[in-house]
């Protein structure tokens, strides 16, 4: 059996998140999907797995809602469903940053495409000859599985620790073009906005994150795999899962709790 795994997020105003959660739960259960959907007033964040027809039908239904017509979905395949359950949760944020003054609903920070970034990585500078710094917005557990070559990493265990950890390195970044990246892009939607509001106007976000980069240009300039928060553990640049049973067992325990 071939399972389709999807990841998607969209920042959009949702005035009745619980109503939407109930609708998504009903459609997802009927389709036999597994995974997690987070909904907040600021938008939606989805990690879902299922058979091809069920996945296609679910996203066709969801994207028929004008609020989600622009939803961009990333796809990969596996031989099993990497999630044990189907969960739909209403949260204060679809990605916790705890900076109430930062909202992608008010406008996105500028980004760089995967193809352009690959060219910059080859040259070691941007189109204006300015040195390039890759800034990893993920935590240390994720980074251990792989990151961009020479990337700046921060000693954080949670995304909410990003602003405090970055403060020690700001002076080192003042003369560079900084490209912030994460798994699929959602964390950088907030991190880069915060950095620019905080006076760092030389920062961009990698459109689509690491997984989008893998999908579009492969693994050039990247060392290792990309950690994902499910039973696949990590994906290589061809989006193939890693089988690390120690981590799978740990994930299974967290799913039960």
Swiss-Prot record:
Q: Which residues form the Rhodanese domain?
A: 128-222
- Which UniProt keyword terms apply here? Oxidoreductase, tRNA processing
PROSITE patterns listed in its UniProt record: RHODANESE_3 (PS50206)
Molecular function GO labels: oxidoreductase activity, acting on paired donors, with incorporation or reduction of molecular oxygen
The protein's name is tRNA uridine(34) hydroxylase
- Which positions are catalytic residues? 182
SUPFAM superfamilies, alphabetically? Answer: Rhodanese/Cell cycle control phosphatase (SSF52821)
Any Pfam family from its record, for instance, is UPF0176_N
Q: What family does this belong to? A: Belongs to the TrhO family.
What is the reaction catalyzed?
uridine(34) in tRNA + AH2 + O2 = 5-hydroxyuridine(34) in tRNA + A + H2O
Q: Which gene encodes it?
A: trhO
GO BP terms: namely:
tRNA modification
| InterPro entries per UniProt | Rhodanese-like_dom, Rhodanese-like_dom_sf, TrhO, TRHO_N
Source lineage: Bacteria, Pseudomonadati, Pseudomonadota, Gammaproteobacteria, Lysobacterales
The answer to whether the entry has keyword tRNA processing is yes
């Amino acid at each position: 059996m071939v399972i389709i795994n999807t990841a998607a997020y969209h920042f959009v105003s949702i005035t009745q998140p619980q109503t939407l959660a109930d609708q998504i739960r009903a459609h997802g259960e009927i389709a036999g999907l597994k995974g997690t959907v987070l909904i907040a007033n600021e938008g939606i964040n989805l990690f879902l797995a299922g058979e091809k027809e069920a996945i296609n039908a679910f996203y066709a239904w969801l994207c028929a809602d004008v609020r989600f017509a622009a939803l961009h979905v990333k796809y990969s395949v596996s031989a099993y469903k990497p999630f044990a359950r189907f969960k739909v949760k209403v949260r204060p944020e679809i990605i916790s940053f705890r900076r109430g003054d930062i909202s992608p609903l008010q406008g996105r920070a500028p980004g760089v495409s995967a193809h352009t970034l690959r060219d910059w990585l080859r040259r070691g500078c941007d189109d204006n000859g300015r040195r390039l710094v890759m800034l990893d917005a993920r935590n240390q557990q994720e980074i251990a599985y792989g990151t961009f070559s020479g990337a700046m990493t921060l000693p954080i265990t949670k995304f909410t620790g990003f602003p405090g950890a970055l403060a020690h390195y700001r002076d080192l970044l003042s003369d560079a073009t900084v490209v912030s990246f994460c798994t699929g892009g959602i964390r950088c939607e907030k991190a880069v906005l915060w950095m620019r509001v905080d006076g760092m106007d030389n920062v961009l976000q990698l459109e689509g994150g690491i997984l989008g980069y893998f999908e579009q240009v492969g693994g050039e300039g990247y060392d290792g795999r990309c950690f994902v928060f499910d039973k696949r553990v990590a994906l290589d640049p061809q989006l193939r899962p890693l089988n690390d049973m120690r981590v799978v067992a740990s994930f299974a325990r967290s799913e039960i709790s």
